[in-house]
Amino acid sequence: MADAKVGIAEGEVAEFPMRSAYLPIPFNAGIKCNPVTSAIGIIILWGLAIYCMVDPEGSLTSLTAAKAGTTYYFTWLYIVTTPIIIFFMAYLYIFHGNQKLGKDHEKPEFGAGSYFSMIFSAGVGIGLFFYGVSEPLWHLSDNRFDTGFHSQAEYGVHAINLTLYHWGLGAWAPYVLVGIAAGIASYRENLPLTMRSCIYPVLGEYTWGFWGDLVDGFSIVVVVSGVCTSLGLGAIQIVDGVNLLTDLGLVADSEEENTARIIAIWIVTGAATLSVVSGLNFGIKFLSILAILASFVLCFLVLFLDDTRFILNLMVEACGWYFQYNVVEVAFATDAFGQLTRGNGRGIDGSSMSGLGAYAAWMNDWTIFYWAWWTAWSSFVGLFIARISRGRTIREVIHFTFAGPLLYAFIWFSTFGGAGIRAYYRVREVIQLGTLQGDADMYAVSGIDGSTCYAPPAYVEVTAPVDGVNITWTFENEFPGISPVCGTIGDISWWNVLHMYYDYGPFLSWVAIFSIAIYFVTSSDSGSLIVDLLANNGRDEPGFWIQRVFWAMTEGAVATALLMSGKSDALKALQAASIVAGLPFTVLLCTVCIGLYRFVHQHAEPEKYEGYNQWKMSFAGGVYCYIDTILSCGGVFSNADRSYIHVPDMRTNWETLRALCLPPWSVLLIMNKLNPGRQNYVSNMTLAVVVGGLFAGWIFLFISSVAKTSLLAFAWLCYFSFAFILAILRYEVRAKYNIIGNIGEDVGAGIIGYYQLLAQILIQLDEEPPALEL
């Protein structure tokens, strides 16, 4: 197995045995990258881009179908992963908060203000504008909690609460996990700043081979998918804003509007390219501070132009609701009954067939989209957090990435979401007032997009009969200058809110467009920086700017392709890409939890971990080494020691083949070694027969399910029972040989690679177990 020898810089010695190729280019330091990792990203991303451009309708159909399948089968996985990560972060904060992302003597590279600005700009910037008003209104109109809350006041605060659920701790949990894991791996353990380093305690030396290449390569795909979602949202928002403020005259859902969005993407991509080439300390840091200052100014102005007392009350109330409901109750809500469709058990209300609560796909369109989006961004934002967190403690990082953004979300959504909901309620008030006066549209005016809005009067008294008795209503408007108010729910909601404040609408809108554009740039340039790190084995070397330009162009191309695919349904294409890309990465995040747990415990209890033994054959090795051999053209590594990765010997091949085809035979051999003697032969044979029956039953029932679908349940019962028995065997062998691991890893190994598990155990049993200490 070998590195790609073509073009390796003369005299270069790899610090870590990862593939590295170098291509000299005139007037530049050249291109240096991991060829396998880069190829994975390039092939998948440009393949997706070309597919979407060549066949927009077909690609949208495929993406939507993939999204539907992902959410249909894996809602539970997305939902349960997030609170697990949050509780794990709480554990680290309490018990290991003083451990540093770096050496004990190192100090933070960036000050608190610039540090928070860069984190926040990379993390959630653009989305705050796109969803700041529209999301609370969507949740309000859906009567999301119709079965439990009945007053309009409760609808309003719960709409804000649900929005905060999506943008609070759950949004930042994947970022913080990867940030802390990568920071400790890189700056304390001296490993490369890549995703593969986060799972080094799990894969060991095999991190530097094919498995690590696969993790980093797919991380590139997921990073670009997540960034493109934000780029698409930013393009939609910028074009909508400029169209409303100028005479562009773009018609909604037209080809001209889509073209304008694509132009916006490439303008910002060009700016992002200049930023990423200029480096972290100048371009990204400066723009991040500028973006957060501009958005803070906008939020401050709206807070004091609107009903300040109401918004401050809402902030306080939202805090209480958030910690009462979102930490546990809503955090584990999968909307199990709500996702049922009509004909499959959806609840009905009297004669209504629409059911209670939101529509069946609500969970897919909102919570699952968000969790997938945050997951897709986790390697990008997490590695970026790690890159700028050197010298900070775990506790400090959690302060800046959990407490800070959560507080900002409370302020932002209470201000803009509260203003939007109050305007929505005022529309209903004014319509009712006009109805009492004989004309529901008495106060109707034209909104900025031509839709119907309303101008609330300053003071009106209306007398109307109720049950035969005349009742007088007094309508007293304390804020007559806040007009017109609009009830439209969608992308336009943001601009409607900004344009209702006296005559300041255009000014506020331009400030918003400026902020969105800056966040747009910071998302793209930060993403390009991290993708380049992943493609270049974690090396952040000056002079190799051309490869960062390439990745910035790739992000722009994929975002363009998704917008071309979706057109009027651009958001659907963007959401689908994030959800599908985020699924396998959710599994990776669970593995990162294991890796981080071992990192902090090895640091806290080094003597305990020094006593553990390793498997003679790694689960990541064995026949999987053939993949590394093929990728390295069968050669020998010339610039690093990789003797642990070699062509499998005949024993390994035979044990794996036997386990793959005849697992009961392997189980019998294992049991005879674990429990030798004639007195144990019957029990050993019995277990082997049971394993064989489950294995054969799985295959037979799985094939038979083609004719009778219901048999699939029994097939999976057989397989998981089979895998669990093998996991117990692995657990016993680990205990006997004092090998590091846990039952979760054992079960996972049994499910995803039973043949590898059995071969691993048989080869391990060739050695004598360590003597017990008295």
Model features per residue range: what roles?
Residues 2-155, 173, 594-600:
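N-terminal alpha-helical transmembrane segments of multi-pass membrane transport
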Residues 10-11, 29-32, 36, 44-52, ...:
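Helix-loop-helix module between adjacent transmembrane segments
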Residues 19-27, 61-67, 95-112, 137-162, ...:
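Flexible loop linkers connecting adjacent transmembrane helices
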Residues 25-30, 56-71, 92-109, 158-166, ...:
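Membrane-water interface regions at transmembrane-helix termini and the short interhelical loops
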Residues 26-36, 70-76, 104-122, 150-170, ...:
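Transmembrane-helix boundary/entry motifs in multi-pass membrane transporters
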Residues 53-74, 138, 236-260, 278-289, ...:
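Membrane-lumen (extracellular) interface motif
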Residues 207-210, 214-517, 562-570:
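Membrane-embedded translocation segments of transport machinery
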Residues 609-774:
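Intracellular leaflet-associated regions of eukaryotic membrane-associated proteins
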